[in-house]
């Protein structure tokens, strides 16, 4: 018996729906449009800020977007923020200071609310224009996401320090940029936020399918009844998926959705 069509489609952007040319292919876009027309809900789940949806927005239809890994729930149809899950800047600051006491070397930036862009310490993305300040200055107020960039080859111990040292206090993950940690409020992940939304829509995890390629998609994979890792996904993501699909540059999302739509 063929699998029933999903009622909820969760799609990561970079390395999944978006190709290496930084665009959504016509085939992928058309598959999402057919799914929406057939009554399925489409949710874009990305680490991107809202402002960086703009280059691909025309291909996303009237979806809901989980930006900053779920910290911001954004309605593309009405162009407004539906939910904001902020991290207390001082909580983030104390975590950074504690890890730095161990001698680990890294630089920090934060994303403000809502979508006002990066502000960072000196040395974070040198050559990139952004407001600069001390750790105390950039952590003033609520933040959407904290960013930790390792210096040199020190990523692994920094990942270990934040991911294990603050379990239950911070949500720590990484996506496509080498040597970059993304930190949100505890409990805020693609999977955690979609669980709340799906309950409101009356959709069970068994009726959902998720597409992704990086560790920040793992919570979404654990939540959804079906999950598809891209052929280009990291090994741990492939292991967590119920299926491994094609490379993202080969319309991998459409290849799966065309079974039903």
Where are these regions (language model features)?
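Residue-level signal for inorganic ion chemistry
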Residues: 15, 35, 46, 69, ...
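Alpha-helical segments flanking ligand/cofactor-binding loops in enzyme cores
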Residues: 29, 33, 218-219, 235-238
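Short, structured coil segments at secondary-structure junctions
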Residues: 59-61, 69, 77, 166-168, ...
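Asp-based phosphoryl-transfer active-site loop
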Residues: 5-21, 221
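Active-site phosphate-binding/coordination module
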Residues: 21-124
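Conserved acidic, metal-coordinating active-site core of Asp-based
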Residues: 98, 102-223, 232
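Asp-based, Mg2+/Mn2+-dependent phosphohydrolase catalytic module
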Residues: 223, 228-261
């Amino acid at each position: 018996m063929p699998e029933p069509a999903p009622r909820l489609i969760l799609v990561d952007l970079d390395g999944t729906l978006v190709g290496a040319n930084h665009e959504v292919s016509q085939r992928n876009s058309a598959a999402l449009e057919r799914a929406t027309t057939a009554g399925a809900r489409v949710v874009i789940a990305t680490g991107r800020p809202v402002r960086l949806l703009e280059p691909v927005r025309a291909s996303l239809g009237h979806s809901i977007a989980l930006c900053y890994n779920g910290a911001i729930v954004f309605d593309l149809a009405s162009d407004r923020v539906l939910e904001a899950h902020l991290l207390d800047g001082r909580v983030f600051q104390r975590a950074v200071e504690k890890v730095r006491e161990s001698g680990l070397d890294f630089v920090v930036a934060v994303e403000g609310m809502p979508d006002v862009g990066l502000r960072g310490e000196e040395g974070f993305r040198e050559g990139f224009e952004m407001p600069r300040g001390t750790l105390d200055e950039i952590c003033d107020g609520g933040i959407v996401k904290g960013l930790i960039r390792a210096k040199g080859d020190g990523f692994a111990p920094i990942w270990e320090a934040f991911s294990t040292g603050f379990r239950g206090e911070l949500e720590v993950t990484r996506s496509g940029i080498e040597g970059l940690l993304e930190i949100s409020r505890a409990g805020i992940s693609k999977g955690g936020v979609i669980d709340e939304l799906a309950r409101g829509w009356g959709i069970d995890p068994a009726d959902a399918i998720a597409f992704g390629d990086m560790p920040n998609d793992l919570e979404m994979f654990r939540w959804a009844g079906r999950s598809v890792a891209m052929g280009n996904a990291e090994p741990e993501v492939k292991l967590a998926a119920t299926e491994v699909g094609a490379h993202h540059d080969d319309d991998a999302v459409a290849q799966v959705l065309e079974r039903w739509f």
